Amino acid sequence: MQRRIMGIETEFGVTCTFHGHRRLSPDEVARYLFRRVVSWGRSSNVFLQNGARLYLDVGSHPEYATAECDSLIQLINHDRAGELVLEDLLVDAEQRLSDEGIGGDIYLFKNNTDSAGNSYGCHENYLVVRAGEFSRISDVLLPFLVTRQLICGAGKVLQTPKAATFCLSQRAEHIWEGVSSATTRSRPIINTRDEPHADAEKYRRLHVIVGDSNMSEMTTLLKVGSAALVLEMIEAGVVFRDFALDNPIRAIREASHDPTGRRPVRLAGGRQASALDIQREYHARAVEHMTNRRPDPEMDMVVDLWGRMLDAVERDDFSKVDTEVDWVIKRKLFQRYQDKYSMELSDPKIAQLDLAFHDIKRGRGVFDVLSRKGLVTRATTDEAIATAVNEPPQTTRAKLRGDFISAAQKAGRDFTVDWVHLKLNDQAQRTVLCKDPFRSVDERVDRLIASM
């Protein structure tokens, strides 16, 4: 499948610093964030005019799920649009707090761990063809996903009793299974809960919950693009070397603790391979595969950055990727800071910097400051992201949902939507079932909108 439906769900960390004596719990702060949403949507779980879903997840984490996208840049635009939507809620909530005499600064972090060691996720969704055994996909995909953090981890400082160490991934410490149907209880790498939000006879939805939330657009491009390409190769029957892991959970932690990519991980049957070896194999197959598929400038960018990143790891020279890959950008920032102020990695100021890197408020968040200084390579533009805040992707089912929501809100009509249903809550209770996520035009939806 060369045109694939993809989406990203991001949970955001919330904290608030108060100016006066009055204090609020994270739950209460999250409710302030969603007060405006509840006022028009009558719920803290809503779909927006751009086709996305916005809701308050368990544990007071706001979650933004992008609409269905069928290209990488489109997906990046809609993922970044989520940051703007949340930032808008943040500004509104701070004003409400101020109006009620509770002075405070709200912080929203696009990261995966808080100071108490809790983890929240960034989930990727890929539509895959149902043909063949699911185990074929998971067998090839698992070693790739376990080692993918080498090319697209967000990076973090891990405080251990002995010392602080720089790790590749924020999420790796919190993954407890390889393949499972649960997401919160056991945190697997691939989630098999089969809710395709499409024709279940044709498709399944692959739910990957192992990835880090990325700040860099280029890192998101690489994270999602490389996974989509591996899925495409699996569907095309490309043969890969067997890298079945002896213990995926131990391997994911070992890989995270090794920015050199050279430490061997145990494979099934007692063999060994490093994260770099494993990624090299998948990249080599991707380079080969690109010569046999239709041209795609986005995928060319993915394969190029993937190769440059592996070269950088191998040579221990990151100068050609240090504006593109999150963990490299972050580590360089820490090193500059340590050199300038003669401090250890374990210094609390580094931990603060680690957190501030993921602050989504423009002008305050460290990543945004780096971006404004031209120290970060972009994959898209501010204009395209701003457009995605209000407009759904024009090439997928999201357009039907977004257009329906816009029309119903304009007409003041009561409605209910989910990923596949559009319903007018009138006497007739007219409902349209949209099973095909690739379809952006539907006469039934046009008739429903016209009837308003």
Swiss-Prot record:
Pathway: Protein degradation; proteasomal Pup-dependent pathway; Protein modification; protein pupylation
EC number: 6.3.1.19
A family per Pfam: Pup_ligase
Active site, renumbered: 57
Catalytic reaction annotation: ATP + [prokaryotic ubiquitin-like protein]-L-glutamate + [protein]-L-lysine = ADP + phosphate + N(6)-([prokaryotic ubiquitin-like protein]-gamma-L-glutamyl)-[protein]-L-lysine
GO-annotated biological processes: modification-dependent protein catabolic process; proteasomal protein catabolic process; protein pupylation
Tagged with keyword Acyltransferase: no
GO molecular function list: ATP binding; ligase activity, forming carbon-nitrogen bonds; magnesium ion binding; ubiquitin-like protein transferase activity
Binding-site positions, Mg(2+): 9, 55, 63
InterPro entries named among the record's database cross-references: Pup_ligase (IPR022279), Pup_ligase/deamidase (IPR004347)
Hydrolase in keyword set: no
Family: Belongs to the Pup ligase/Pup deamidase family. Pup-conjugating enzyme subfamily.
Note: The reaction mechanism probably proceeds via the activation of Pup by phosphorylation of its C-terminal glutamate, which is then subject to nucleophilic attack by the substrate lysine, resulting in an isopeptide bond and the release of phosphate as a good leaving group.
NCBIfam families: pupylate_PafA (TIGR03686)
Function per UniProt: Catalyzes the covalent attachment of the prokaryotic ubiquitin-like protein modifier Pup to the proteasomal substrate proteins, thereby targeting them for proteasomal degradation. This tagging system is termed pupylation. The ligation reaction involves the side-chain carboxylate of the C-terminal glutamate of Pup and the side-chain amino group of a substrate lysine.
Protein's name according to its UniProt entry: Pup--protein ligase
Origin species: Gordonia bronchialis (strain ATCC 25592 / DSM 43247 / BCRC 13721 / JCM 3198 / KCTC 3076 / NBRC 16047 / NCTC 10667)
